[in-house]
Curated annotation (Swiss-Prot):
Keywords: Chloroplast, Fatty acid biosynthesis, Fatty acid metabolism, Heme, Iron, Lipid biosynthesis, Lipid metabolism, Lyase, Membrane, Metal-binding, Oxylipin biosynthesis, Plastid, Transit peptide. Its main location: plastid. It comes from Oryza sativa subsp. japonica (Rice). One of its GO terms (biological process) is oxylipin biosynthetic process. Involved in the biosynthesis of jasmonic acid, a growth regulator that is implicated also as a signaling molecule in plant defense. Converts 13-hydroperoxylinolenic acid to 12,13-epoxylinolenic acid. This is Allene oxide synthase 1, chloroplastic. Its EC number is 4.2.1.92. Expressed in coleoptiles, and at lower level in leaves of dark-grown seedlings. The keyword Lipid biosynthesis applies. Residues 23-43 are annotated as: Disordered. (13S)-hydroperoxy-(9Z,11E,15Z)-octadecatrienoate binds at N315. The lineage of its organism: Eukaryota, Viridiplantae, Streptophyta, Embryophyta, Tracheophyta.
Length: 512
């Protein structure tokens, strides 16, 4: 089976080539080993010039933008066409938004599992202000601060801010499972009411409310519905996120209108200032204990507030808004046989643990965990990663080495890396038991939704998601709650601006 990391060689005046093994500064030997073993550093692949071109200034970028948003096959088709045209999974192209939002849209695109992981190595790539790609939204949308997602690990504030997020996710850890079950139990009750009343239930609408309520109650101990924020939180967050990501989104408007308003101009932050201020006021009060911890770490209180808001609203709520419908979509399509296997596993593990959902019970549900990993593989919630080369180097695909120069922007389209047919059999299929057993465990290092391999743990010195394990946990809890209650379910699937639109059309209650 093909391997999945980039082997990097530094260009040097000396005829000798120094090969750098990929390794984090994490103290855990398992994480370091996982990152090194993804590819053998002894390979010497033939060098090839990175194919592709950027076209004329401005015109080439606009051409690529139109093809990306409006061409045949959508964005998957945009990248697949480049791979076919150049017979290469490393190519030069322009990434949206381009003119007149991004100063320089030119990237070297990494479109396979072998080249993609170079983006995780912060000794080789700089991550400064690259969270959203070739442009950065105005800091007016984040209280005037560059929040953690935009910081490179070399910056002095990165470590204390990431430490604060680890604290945020862990300081009420005993409340996570019971609060999730309470909030999402209510969600399924509301969905049953909708099914009885109108014959269908919009999972996304109910999930938005439940996700925000759970995050605030589980991690902060505050119910936003009982604050001045009321039930407006999800609506305010969605609008705020739109203003940050609009240059990268398609809303289904007429092409010329959409491309002019969303992709060529920035939406004015002033239009969402009142909404953002309402969110910030809530978190100043609700997150006082976490802000106090931030102050102890040397973080100014206001900076802590805006980082907590971003972490919970953009990263965590945004992640659950995309991932949970994705998970329900793929499982809904998997059918009753898969549902039966999951229900049997979930109910057996809970029964064997005194009827309680505990971490021990969850550990006895390997199929549930595999089903979550498979959703994260086939449709990762964040599809794109960026990094700027810190020095001249050679990035390797499966077959060739490509010289990249210092300062060039590297871009990875994750769905092509995690559906690489040289790594995954039946890559376009959702296979819920893909990660079971020893062979499945070996594949986990190629699951990289968290901006790092699933087999590695996030540290203060990398950009791997601080909430990596939390996200997998709550996704597993969703399946546990679902299959404790129901034997099977049916869905209708559509598209939405962020992720999938999922309507549940039936819920078959548990019979065993």
């Amino acid at each position: 089976m093909a391997t999945a990391a980039a082997c990097i060689s530094f260009a040097s005046p000396s005829p000798a080539r120094v090969v750098i093994r990929r390794q984090t500064r994490a103290s855990a030997s398992a994480s370091a080993t996982d990152r090194q073993e993804v590819v053998s550093p002894k390979r010497r692949l033939p060098l090839r010039k990175v194919p592709g071109d950027y076209g004329p200034p401005v015109v080439g970028a606009i051409r690529d933008r139109y093809e990306y948003f409006y061409g045949p096959g959508g964005r998957d088709g945009f990248f697949a066409a480049r791979v076919r045209a150049h017979r290469s999974t490393v190519v030069r192209l322009n990434m949206p938004p381009g003119p007149f939002v991004a100063r320089d849209p030119r990237v070297v695109a990494l479109l396979d599992a072998a080249s993609f992981p170079v983006l995780f190595d912060t000794s080789l790539v700089d991550k400064t202000d690259l969270f959203t790609g070739t442009f950065m939204p105005s800091t007016d949308l984040t209280g005037g601060y560059r929040v953690l997602s935009y910081l490179d690990p070399s910056e002095p504030n990165h470590a204390p801010l990431k430490t604060l997020l680890f604290y945020l996710l862990s300081h009420r850890r005993q409340q996570v499972i019971p609060k999730f079950r309470e909030v999402y139990g209510d969600l399924f009750g509301l969905m049953e009411n909708d099914l009885a009343r109108v014959g269908k239930a919009d999972f996304g609408v109910h999930n938005d409310a439940a996700a925000f309520g759970f995050l605030c109650q589980g991690l902060l101990g505050r119910d936003p519905a009982k604050s001045a924020l009321g039930r407006d939180g999800p609506k305010l967050i969605t609008k705020w996120v739109l203003f940050q990501l609009s240059p990268l989104l398609s809303l289904g408007l007429p092409t010329l209108v959409e491309d002019t308003l969303l992709h060529s101009l920035r939406l004015p932050p002033a239009l969402v200032k009142k909404d953002y201020d309402r969110l910030a006021d809530f978190f100043r009060d609700a997150a006082k204990a976490v802000v106090d911890e931030g102050e102890r770490l040397g973080i100014a209180r206001e900076e802590a507030v805006h980082n907590i808001l971003f972490a919970l609203c953009f990263n965590s709520f945004g992640g659950m808004k995309i991932l949970f419908p994705t998970l329900v979509k793929w499982l809904g399509r998997a059918g009753a046989r898969v549902h039966g296997r999951l229900a049997t596993e979930v109910r057996g593990a809970v029964r064997d643990n005194g009827g309680e959902v505990t971490m021990k019970a969850l550990a006895e549900m390997p199929l549930v965990k595999s089903a979550v990993y498979e959703a994260l593989r086939i449709e990762p919630p964040v599809a794109m990663q960026y990094g700027r080369a810190k020095r001249d180097m050679v990035v390797e695909s499966h077959d060739y080495g490509y010289e990249v120069r210092e300062g060039e922007m590297l871009f990875g389209y994750q769905p092509m890396a995690t559906k690489d047919p040289r790594v995954f059999a039946r890559p376009e299929e959702y296979v819920p038991d893909r990660f079971l057993g020893e062979d499945g465990a070996r594949l986990l290092r190629h699951v990289v939704w968290s901006n790092g391999p699933e087999t590695a743990a996030p540290t203060l010195h990398d950009k791997q998601c601080a909430g990596k394990d939390f996200v997998v946990l709550v996704a597993r809890l969703l399946l546990v709650e679902l299959f404790l209650r129901y034997d099977s379910f049916d869905v209708e699937v559509g598209t939405s601006t962020l992720g999938s639109s999922v309507t549940v059309t039936s819920l078959k209650k548990a019979t065993f």
